[in-house]
Amino acid sequence: MKQAINNLKDYAELAQASYFYFDLLKDSNGIARKIYELDSKGNKIEDTSYPRGYKEVAISLEHIVSKEYRGQEALINLKQDDTWKSNLLNTLDEKTNFNQLNGEFNPLQVQNFAKRYKICFHQPNTKSGFSATLFSEKRKQKDTESKEIKYTNKYGYINYILAIISTESKEVV
C-alpha cells in the first residue's frame, strides 16, 4: 500500500512536470538555448564578451522545472555572422520572442527531480493542443567507493513514463 501511494505521488509530480516548456532546452537545430545569468538581487550580470552585453548560461533541466526561474526569458540563439540580413533577423527575433520558463517546483523538488529523471523526448504543443513528454527514471545504485545510494543511468533506466496532455487549441481544427 505504501509503495502504491509513493507511485501515485511520483506520477502526480510527473504529470505536473509535463506542462513545463521542455522545448526551451534546445532550438530547432538542437543547439542549447540560454537565459541571462542573474546576481543575488535578480539583476542581469553585465559582460561585454557576450553578444547581448550580459552573461548568459545554457538552460538546464533544473532551470525548466524551478519556480525560481519562472517568467525568465528563454533567449533566441543569435545568428553569428555579421551580415546586415543576420543583424536584421536577430533584431526581429529578439523583439518577437515571448518564450518564458514556467517551472513550479521548489528547490528540493528540483534537486530530486533532476537526479531521478531524464527527458527522453518532448513534443511541444501542436496547433491542436497536443503535447507529450517521455520521461525515463534512473536506477538507484549503491556507489562502491562512497557507499552512497544515488540515481544513475549507467545500467539503463528502470521505467519510462509517457505523459500526454491536451491544452487549449489556438485554432479550430
Description of each model-found segment:
Residues 1-173:
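Non-catalytic, mobile gating and regulatory segments of ester bond hydrolases
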